[in-house]
UniProtKB/Swiss-Prot annotation:
HAMAP family: NDH1_NuoM. NDH-1 shuttles electrons from NAD(P)H, via FMN and iron-sulfur (Fe-S) centers, to quinones in the respiratory chain. The immediate electron acceptor for the enzyme in this species is believed to be plastoquinone. Couples the redox reaction to proton translocation (for every two electrons transferred, four hydrogen ions are translocated across the cytoplasmic membrane), and thus conserves the redox energy in a proton gradient. GO terms for biological process: ATP synthesis coupled electron transport; electron transport coupled proton transport. This is NAD(P)H-quinone oxidoreductase chain 4. NCBIfam families: NDH_I_M, PRK02546.1, PRK12561.1. It is found in: Cellular thylakoid membrane. Belongs to the complex I subunit 4 family. Its EC number is 7.1.1.-. It is a multi-pass membrane protein. The keyword Secreted does not apply. One of its GO terms (cellular component) is plasma membrane-derived thylakoid membrane.
């Protein structure tokens, strides 16, 4: 078969899903689930290797449009088709999905309860998350977006902590109800005009009136604000993280939150640019609220998982600011922040899980003095925390700096608007090391809990755990030292996207129109002569 016509994306989506069929038939003579774990890990790695191969052989960095495109009629009477493709916006997140999921499978080695069902859900979620980033049909996007909720709900409700049913129910209520807004907006856009279609490129080409755009934008924003999440629609996340296991933490922080940021750019910005110009100042304000409020709330948390969860909410505020900056640098920083936080968030939550497995507590006051028992975990926790507080030389620093500079240099907003926003966001950056460093002090060098530190099970990191963190730190440091590793994947796309949406900004459009008019006046004035060059 010609490699140019091979259905790469469909293969990457359906391979892990189809592989789940074999899970009930894998023999497990010892009843510990070891063969099942190895099978799931092999399937995850095979899919990731195929993804890397497809990326290096099929993806063109200089191309801003869709690549590896596939179109198959599904319900032609309704204008629905299985249409997938990857561009600079989706490809980094597809790569992130393969990387994080493979490591999450390795991180799930201690899971012994119902391993067949557990890995069935993980592999099904793997394919579904790639589909969310690849599908180019709005109705199919809604379907895979909804189907993603089922594995997460079951992973929370079956393998979660003491309040797992409450956390899982809250998650499904928030996300399922908000997702109805996607369906309503999708149907409205599909039926608008003479042609019934759910194809994203066809929808982007339609000429919607501004009021219609604003209504659809609001519907999409509500749904994606829950998943991102945006304050005040964030309260499901601390509860979900508070009850999840380590591998589910990694999937939530590493991939699930990025679905909200990706969808906000793909649907709100690309399909509804005029409405985005009106909503952009509000998005920036919401981003600042996310940064400040979540940072202050994280500082007050005494539960380790909830503290890191609020830290995630704070960092996602930079994504909102970058998306609304109307600059190449700001938009690029938003995409980089999603990738960076996916890596950093996954590493921190994995270490939280490793610490809990040893201490059996998440309350900071009940920890203390464990650095002497767990020096390797302390070193890894400290390094990942430095990445989270945007230490120079790590990916978080580059992403946040790009967002800051992108907004500060944006000509879409007045100086009176930009300066307070940059100052307030900067305060949020200052708060981050305060709560993260105090967290490290309380866990590892706080008042020693003799009963805890003398326990024989309080052992240091094992090779598997060191390997997982090492795999996450390599791209975190690599991107921090040489950001082009990742930015070259999406630079062409973000540049094209910003050029597409900038004319929708009234202030920019007025200036450009005035410039064009002045040039036209000069050209039309027959008496005008260029000054002679002496």
């Amino acid at each position: 078969m010609n490699p140019d016509t091979f259905p790469w994306l469909s293969t990457l989506i359906f391979f892990p899903i189809m592989a789940t069929v074999a899970l009930p038939f894998i023999p497990d003579p010892k009843g510990k689930g070891d063969p099942i774990r190895w099978y799931a890990l092999v399937i995850g790695l095979i899919d990731f290797v195929l993804l890397i191969y497809a990326f290096y052989t099929q993806y063109d960095f200089a191309e801003s449009g869709l690549q590896m495109v596939e179109h198959y009629d599904w319900l032609p009477q309704l204008g629905v088709q299985w249409s997938v493709g990857a561009d600079g916006l989706s490809m980094p997140l597809i790569l992130l999905t393969g990387f994080i999921t493979s490591l999450a499978i390795l991180a799930s080695w201690p899971v012994t309860y119902k391993p067949r069902l557990f890995y069935f859900l993980i592999l099904a979620m793997y394919g579904g998350q790639i589909a969310v980033f690849a599908v180019q049909d709005l109705l199919v996007f809604f379907l895979v977006w909804e189907l993603e909720l089922v594995p997460v709900y079951l992973l929370l409700s079956i393998w979660g902590g003491y309040k797992r049913l409450y956390a899982a129910t809250k998650f499904i209520l928030y996300t399922a109800i908000s997702s109805l807004f996607i369906l309503v907006a999708a149907l409205a856009m599909a039926f608008f005009g003479p042609d019934l279609t759910f194809d994203l490129q066809s929808l982007a080409a339609k000429d919607y009136p501004l009021t219609f755009q604003l209504l659809c934008y609001t519907g999409f924003l509500v749904a994606f604000a829950v998943k991102l999440p945006i304050v005040p629609l964030h309260t499901w996340l601390p509860d979900a993280h508070g009850e999840a296991t380590a591998p589910v933490h990694m999937l939530l922080a590493g991939i699930l939150l990025k679905m909200g940021g990706y969808a906000l750019i793909r649907m709100n910005v690309e399909l509804l640019p005029d409405a985005h110009a009106y909503f952009a100042p509000a998005l920036i304000i919401l981003g600042v609220v996310n940064i400040i409020y979540a940072a202050l709330t994280s500082f007050a948390q005494r539960n380790l998982k909830r503290k890191i969860a609020y830290s995630s909410i704070s960092h996602m505020g930079f994504v909102l600011i970058g998306i609304a900056s109307f600059t190449d640098l700001g938009m690029s920083g938003a995409v980089l922040q999603m990738v960076s936080h996916g890596l950093i968030g996954a590493s921190l939550f994995f270490l939280v899980g490793a610490t809990y497995d040893r201490t059996h507590t998440l309350i900071l006051e009940e920890m203390g003095g464990v650095a002497q028992n767990m020096p390797k975990i302390f070193a890894m926790f400290t390094t990942c925390s430095m990445a989270s507080l945007a230490l120079p030389g790590m990916s978080g620093f580059v992403a946040e700096l790009m967002v800051f500079v992108g907004l500060a240099t944006s000509d879409a907003y007045s100086l009176a608007f930009r300066v307070p926003v940059v100052i307030l966001a900067g305060i949020g950056v200052i708060l981050t090391p305060i709560y993260l460093l105090s967290m490290l002090r309380e866990i590892f060098y706080g008042p020693e809990n003799k009963e805890l530190t003398s326990h024989e099970k309080l052992v240091d990191a094992e090779p598997r755990e060191i390997f997982v963190i090492a795999c996450l730190l390599v791209p975190i440091i690599g991107i921090g030292l040489y950001p082009k590793i990742i930015t070259q994947i999406y630079d062409a796309k973000t540049t094209q996207l910003v050029a597409y949406i900038r004319p929708s900004v009234p202030s920019i459009a007025m200036r450009e129109a005035a410039t064009v008019a002045s040039v036209s006046d000069i050209e039309m004035d027959s008496s005008y002569q260029a000054p002679a060059i002496k």
